[in-house]
């Protein structure tokens, strides 16, 4: 009977770790949905000004704001994430400026396009930020899933363009529920 103890203990530890992983993912998803924001801003905002507003919207601390702005600028130098043909920009980065994943949408107050030349053709700037921490793969997978939905599901982009905050939050919740169910199936 004694020889079976280590296997049982290992199984318990594996299950405990799985529970911790599920709990972590559930908390990240809940936070992302609750903290989602639709921010209406001046249609004349430039790319630089938008980045400042993104930073200010995430944290009151100037050093963290700078981390967010720098991370988004760095990511943009790797290749533009502006898609004027689809009227949106996808600005995403990993940064120590945030403690949890972020999904925020900036749109002009007018509901039309941004007017600044460096924002030409853009009706919505979608911001996705993830923290620099040990759960990089989990957060990247979740935000990657949302990026995929932007491309695959016309309803998602249409709702971002024309909907209100609660409409977008509702879709986020629906998509992340599907993501979470898939996540549970893999564990």
Segments from the language model and where they lie:
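Cytosolic covalent-transfer regions centered on His/Cys nucleophiles
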Residues: 1-187
